UniProtKB/Swiss-Prot annotation:
This is Glyceraldehyde-3-phosphate dehydrogenase. It comes from the Eukaryota. InterPro entries: GlycerAld/Erythrose_P_DH, GlycerAld_3-P_DH_AS, GlycerAld_3-P_DH_cat, GlycerAld_3-P_DH_NAD(P)-bd, Glyceraldehyde-3-P_DH_1, NAD(P)-bd_dom_sf. Pathway: Carbohydrate degradation; glycolysis; pyruvate from D-glyceraldehyde 3-phosphate: step 1/5. One of its GO terms (cellular component) is cytosol. The gene is gpd-1. Keywords: Cytoplasm, Glycolysis, NAD, Oxidoreductase. Its EC number is 1.2.1.12. CDD domains: GAPDH_I_C (cd18126), GAPDH_I_N (cd05214). The active site is at C151 (nucleophile). D-glyceraldehyde 3-phosphate binds at S150, C151, T152, T181, T210, G211, R233.
Length: 338
């Protein structure tokens, strides 16, 4: 079953979701909406990407629309989500990637244009959050607006699930060493709510807040209140890494922990949690579609109950792939209920 998908917001994640969809057999992007980009510029931005390279295919402009690999993609420029005529193209599932409409009420506006479901590509204050491989099986089709959580939660949650299921996490602290993103500054500038966040991204390591660890408690209720974390924004353009330091109830050697993670990466979490013993660095993970790539040689343990685990993630590519995997999954659940 091919699912027809629309994208609202053709920024960083919107475009990377589009590129990933080309490799996703059961996803067809039929429409894009962005009020700030004209079709010719959208085609240019999709064709050329500093981080992920040139688009491997054909991109043309036909009037006000795009033609990608010979298939027409309707291009809208509506500012109000409620005004986007998604039903014209049959787009049933909408990726809400503007970063603006992140609540159930705001994202629900897409339903007025004929969409059936909205997937927010960011954490949401009130929409149910799903992380593939962790709690996606709890989706029952009742919610019209859902969230794919954050890229960091998608990296941390599968790892935390494996550790908790096998050894029981008593408590833990997470640090994500995170590449800079579009919200940061190219030169020092005003940032009233976060003074440090206003400093030049390419020249500083910037301590920052993140709700990613606490959000794990929403997708793994048993870990609610047991994890928290922070971020260090660093001068790299893409790829980030999670450092999870946890106290576990059931003692285990580091080798035993590695074996459990390796087994999960080859079994139930294949494609979501990956495992490597190579001497990798961040750029080696650019374009990796996994949510979380466990680095077996980077972790350490103090004793059998206190361990530090390290896992990489392409915060653009891997996250965008999960957005599409989530749509593919929920569309099958929805079809059974129809």
């Amino acid at each position: 079953m091919v699912v027809k998908v629309g994208i609202n917001g053709f920024g960083r994640i919107g475009r990377i979701v589009f590129r990933n969809a080309i490799e996703h057999d059961d996803i067809h992007i039929v429409a894009v909406n962005d009020p700030f980009i004209e079709p010719k510029y959208a085609a240019y931005m999709l064709r050329y990407d500093t981080t992920h390279g040139n688009f491997k295919g054909t991109i043309e402009v036909d009037g006000a629309d795009l033609v990608v690999n010979g298939k027409k993609v309707k291009f809208y420029t509506e500012r109000d989500p409620a005004a986007i005529p998604w039903s014209e193209t049959g787009a049933d599932y909408i990726v809400e990637s503007t970063g603006v409409f992140t609540t159930t009420e705001k994202a629900s506006a897409h339903l007025k244009g004929g969409a059936k479901k909205v997937i927010i590509s960011a954490p949401s204050a009130d929409a149910p959050m799903y992380v593939m491989g962790v709690n996606n099986e709890t989706y029952d089709g009742s919610a019209d607006v859902i969230s794919n959580a954050s890229c960091t939660t998608n990296c941390l949650a599968p790892l935390a699930k494996v550790i908790h299921d096998n050894f029981t996490i008593v408590e833990g602290l997470m640090t994500t060493v995170h590449s800079y993103t579009a919200t940061q500054k190219t030169v020092d500038g005003p940032s009233a709510k976060d003074w440090r966040g206003g400093r030049t991204a390419a020249q500083n390591i910037i301590p920052s807040s993140t709700g990613a660890a606490k959000a794990v408690g929403k997708v793994i209720p048993d870990l609610n209140g047991k994890l928290t974390g922070m971020a260090m924004r660093v001068p790299t353009a893409n790829v980030s890494v999670v450092d999870l330091t946890a106290r576990i109830e059931k003692g285990a050697t580091y080798d035993e922990i590695k074996e459990v993670i390796k087994k999960a990466s080859e079994g139930p979490l294949a494609g979501i949690l990956a495992y490597t013993e190579d001497e990798v660095v961040s750029s080696d993970m650019n374009g990796n579609p996994a949510s979380s790539i466990f680095d077996a040689k980077a972790g350490i343990s103090l004793n059998k109950n206190f361990v530090k685990l390290v896992s990489w993630y392409d915060n653009e590519w891997g996250y965008s792939r999960r957005v599409l995997d989530l749509i593919s999954y929920i569309s099958k659940v929805d079809a059974k209920k129809a």
